[in-house]
């Protein structure tokens, strides 16, 4: 159904006293323009990562995604306070430039002289509670596209959540022809284009763009776990990975007439998320969640079950509730093994080829782990030395998150969709 509830959730603080962002980082995020709602800003913070390192402050793809969610989580607590006073208090050195939330600017002297807003962690707000958003459905949609992506990242302490749905009825109309237009394009390129389309105008529930986005997501995830490939396609389509297990995987939309999988009738869906911290360095997983956010901005997806999220994320209207869909987690490295096992069983990959892919995946995981743990240590040292200017460059994680998790069960659940 079409979305009727426009709630969003802000970040947790990861053990800090305040939102983990400081003046230097906020200035860096807004250097291209003062409006966080600009399409270019949005596409920047979901698509960085074509190279693994970008800058000292934004070291990887997941950094800007997390940092922008911190910036919005802090600054939006200004207008969402009781009585909706938008310009009488600052977050860091920033205030909104107008009640319409057009942009963020340095606060005037009289506001700078007053204490900054002490934002709260894990807050849930409703866009319709702020009059200027409630009155302008088009602007609310544009804002909510981004706030949906923020929510999908912050419902749990792990990586961003994606929605995967398989339903033969989605292929009706001109979707198949539109999908052919993307033949030979990468998943990242397709996702980027669809995000632009969503920002330009709201998608109708189960309209052409909404259905095509869900098909693209299902093709990606079924390919990601090795269920579909050149010998077992989904209506001739699948995503081919150039170097599975590499630090920067590229997934290309491909076609094959060899064999098409038999798809059971009916509508089946699930939610999936990476639980290992190396999602921060995988732009495909980030873009998958962002496409899910585009869907959420116009459509009400199934609820995520309360038991799949921490207490602070339960019973959020339109997002989580009792008897909802289970949220399936996986370790990025372990999913490479699941992928290889399926391709080998289907005769697409030899044991020797699997050994090569898994050796590369081991090297990639160690490289990413070394980088992420180094940045985390540096951030901890910085925060101890600067208690009044704390920040995290990547979403906080624990060593336990590098474990295998429920990867096998998640892989089987995705495979069961067809």
UniProtKB/Swiss-Prot annotation:
Entry-linked InterPro entries: Sigma_1_2_reovir (IPR004317)
Keyword Signal found: no
Principal localisation: virion
Localization: Virion
UniProt entry keywords in alphabetical sequence: Capsid protein, Inner capsid protein, Virion
Superkingdom of origin organism: Viruses
Record GO cellular component, one term: viral inner capsid
Keyword Transmembrane: no
Oligomeric and partner information: Interacts with protein mu-NS; in viral inclusions.
Function: Inner capsid (core) component.
Family: Belongs to the orthoreovirus sigma-1 protein family.
Note: Mutant ts447 is temperature-sensitive.
Record protein name field: Inner capsid protein sigma-2
Organism whose genome encodes this protein: Reovirus type 3 (strain Dearing) (T3D)
């Amino acid at each position: 159904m079409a979305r009727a509830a426009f709630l969003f959730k802000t970040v947790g603080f990861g053990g800090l006293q305040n939102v983990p962002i400081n003046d230097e980082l906020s200035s860096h995020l807004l250097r291209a323009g003062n409006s966080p709602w600009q399409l270019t800003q949005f596409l920047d913070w979901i698509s960085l990562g074509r190279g693994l390192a970008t800058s000292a402050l934004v070291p990887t793809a997941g950094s800007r995604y997390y940092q922008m969610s911190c910036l919005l989580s802090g600054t939006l607590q200004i207008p969402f306070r009781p009585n909706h006073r938008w310009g009488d208090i600052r977050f860091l050195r920033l205030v909104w430039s107008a009640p319409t939330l057009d942009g963020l600017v340095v606060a005037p002297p009289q506001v700078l002289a007053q204490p900054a807003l002490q934002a709260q962690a894990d807050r849930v707000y409703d866009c319709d509670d702020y009059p200027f958003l409630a009155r302008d459905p088009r602007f609310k949609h544009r804002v909510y596209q981004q706030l949906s992506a923020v929510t999908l990242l912050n419902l749990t302490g792990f990586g961003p959540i994606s929605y995967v749905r398989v339903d033969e009825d989605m292929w009706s109309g001109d979707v198949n022809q539109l999908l052919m237009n993307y033949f030979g394009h990468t998943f990242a390129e397709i996702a980027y284009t669809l995000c632009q389309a969503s920002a330009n105008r709201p998608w109708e529930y189960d309209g052409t763009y909404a259905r095509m986005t869900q098909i693209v997501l299902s093709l990606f995830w079924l390919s990601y776990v090795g269920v579909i490939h050149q010998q077992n396609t989904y209506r001739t389509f699948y995503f081919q990975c150039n170097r599975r297990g590499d630090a920067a995987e590229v997934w290309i939309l491909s076609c094959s007439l060899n064999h098409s999988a038999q798809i059971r009738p009916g509508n089946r869906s699930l939610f999936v998320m990476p639980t290992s911290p190396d999602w921060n360095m995988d732009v495909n997983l980030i873009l998958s969640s962002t496409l899910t956010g585009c869907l959420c901005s116009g459509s009400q997806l199934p609820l995520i079950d309360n038991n799949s999220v921490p207490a602070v994320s339960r019973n959020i209207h339109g997002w989580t509730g009792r008897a909802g869909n289970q949220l399936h987690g996986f370790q990025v490295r372990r999913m490479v093994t699941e992928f290889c096992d399926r391709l080998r069983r289907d005769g697409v990959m030899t044991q020797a080829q699997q050994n090569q892919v898994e050796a590369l995946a081991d090297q990639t995981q160690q490289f990413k782990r070394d980088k992420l743990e180094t940045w985390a240590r540096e951030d901890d040292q910085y925060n101890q030395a600067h208690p009044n200017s704390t920040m995290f460059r990547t979403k906080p994680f624990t060593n336990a998150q590098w474990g295998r998790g429920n990867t096998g069960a998640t892989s089987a659940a995705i495979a069961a969709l067809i």
